[in-house]
Amino acid sequence: MSGIKRTASSNRWMLEHFDDHYVKLAQKMGLRSRAAFKLEEIQQKDQLIRPGMTVVDLGAAPGGWSQVAVKLAGDRGKVIACDILPMDPIVGVDFLQGDFREDKVLQALLTRVGDAKVDVVLSDMAPNMSGSDSVDQPRAMYLVELALDMCHQVLAPNGCFAVKVFQGEGFDEYMKAVKAVFKVVKTRKPDSSRARSREVYLVATGYKL
């Protein structure tokens, strides 16, 4: 390991992470990640999840969003989560580990959803970042396209969709695609999202197809 040097950007990320107010608060509150606060802020503004709803959480690990979703959906609700990474169990969450880009994983996820329609699709998916926009942005846009396709397959009429998108090439076209199938689409930048990050969240309500 002595021959491996950390880059300035990775060192900066480590310093930011461990000095981050939301990281410390998440640890104090027993939340799995600081990302939980992003969904909580979106929920406060847009009221996406209500008791009894069925929610699909894509890119769920380590479980911050699933923790929030299962609390909001309550005992009568259902949360189905998926991630390529492992996730420790959460009471009330049906977790599938697998690569959402693979058809066999999609089919397994659809099997868990069953015949009932889903009320909310959440996606906090992001690719492993290489540091090259020309590589990272297409990968990120591919994931959000898959998340929108999931909406087309499982979302109930008037259902909701919240998805992390990185601003850059393909963003405007994706926004148009989301607006074409939802009645209202808002762009959110939660306070808990790092200011220098290009990530925003599209919050779409009133699914039309």
Swiss-Prot record:
**Which molecular-function annotations from GO does this UniProt entry contain?**
rRNA (uridine-2'-O-)-methyltransferase activity
Q: Which Pfam family would be a valid example here?
A: FtsJ
Task: Indicate which residues the UniProt annotation says bind S-adenosyl-L-methionine.
Answer: G63, W65, D83, D99, D124
Q: Where would you find this protein in the cell?
A: Cytoplasm
Cystine pairs: none
Q: Please explain the role this protein plays, according to its UniProt record.
A: Specifically methylates the uridine in position 2552 of 23S rRNA at the 2'-O position of the ribose in the fully assembled 50S ribosomal subunit.
Q: Which NCBIfam families match?
A: PRK11188.1 (NF008390)
Native source organism of the sequence: Shewanella baltica (strain OS155 / ATCC BAA-1091)
User: Does Lipid metabolism appear among the keywords?
Assistant: no
Q: What is its EC number?
A: 2.1.1.166
Which keywords has UniProt assigned to this entry? Answer: Cytoplasm, Methyltransferase, rRNA processing, S-adenosyl-L-methionine, Transferase
Protein name (Swiss-Prot/TrEMBL): Ribosomal RNA large subunit methyltransferase E
Question: What family does this belong to?
Answer: Belongs to the class I-like SAM-binding methyltransferase superfamily. RNA methyltransferase RlmE family.
As its record notes, the protein acts as a catalyst of:
uridine(2552) in 23S rRNA + S-adenosyl-L-methionine = 2'-O-methyluridine(2552) in 23S rRNA + S-adenosyl-L-homocysteine + H(+)
Top-level taxon: Bacteria
SUPFAM superfamilies (UniProt xref): S-adenosyl-L-methionine-dependent methyltransferases
Which HAMAP family does this one have? RNA_methyltr_E (MF_01547)
InterPro entries associated with the record: RNA_methyltr_RlmE, RNA_MeTrfase_FtsJ_dom, rRNA-MeTfrase_E, SAM-dependent_MTases_sf
Q: Please tell me which top-level EC class this enzyme sits in.
A: transferase
One Gene Ontology cellular component: cytoplasm
Q: Which residues form the active site?
A: K164
